Amino acid sequence: MNRVNIMRLSAFTVMLAVLSSVCSGQRLTGPHPTGDVPAPVALDTHGLFQEKFARVGDDVFISGQPTEQGLRDLHAQGVTTVVNLRTPEEMSTRVPFNEPALIKELGMDYVYLPMRGTPEFPYSADALKSFAAAMSGAKGKVLLHCTIAWRASHLWAAYLIKYRDVPVATALEQARMINLMDDMRMDGDRQPVEAFLGRTIPEVGHPKR
C-alpha cells in the first residue's frame, strides 16, 4: 500500500472515530430505536465507497458499493450488519472481491436483498419488510448499500415513511440528501419508493420516458 492510500485510510478512520465520539443518543437500530430520525450527513468517501457515503444518526450508514477496506474500517467502528441490494450479476461481474466471504470473516451479519426493478428482482413490500427486520434485529450499527446509493435511498425513504412515521415530504427530502434522484425511474409506472410502499406518491418525481 502506497503512502497516499495509507494517508487516505488514516483520515477516514479518524473521521469515523470523531463521529463516533459525538453521539446524539439516537439509536435507529435494534428493537427499541430512540428519538426522531435525524437528517443524513454526507461524508467524504475517501475512495472507499462508490460515489456516496452518508451517516444517519449514530448507527446507520448508507453508501454506494464499499471496497474491502471500507468494510473493514466500518467493522472496526462497530458496524455489525451489512444490507446489500445489488443483484448476483452485479456482485459477480463488478465487485473485485467476495463481499459475503469478507463479511463472514469479519463476523458481521450479511442481509442480502437483491433488487433492480425486474420481475426476478422487484422493488417490493416484502423487501421493505425484510429491511425493517434487519434494522430491528441489528446488534450494532448497520450499513445499507447498493451501487451508488440510489436504490438504498429509495428503500430508506420507504422505511422512514412506513416504519418510523416520518412525513412523506420529509422522508423524500432526507433521501434526496443521500442519492434519491427524481429524474431516474424504474421500468414501469412507479418509482422504487412507491413500489416498496405499494401506493402512488405524488411528491416524488415521475419523468417521462
Task: For each feature predicted by the language model, list its residue ranges.
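A phosphate-binding catalytic loop at a beta-strand-loop-alpha-helix junction
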Residues: 143-155
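Bacterial N-terminal signal peptides
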Residues: 10-21
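Coiled-coil-like amphipathic alpha-helices with heptad-repeat character
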Residues: 3, 21-22
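Cys-dependent protein tyrosine phosphatase-like superfamily
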Residues: 23-142, 157-209
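Bacterial N-terminal signal peptides that target proteins for export
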Residues: 2-11
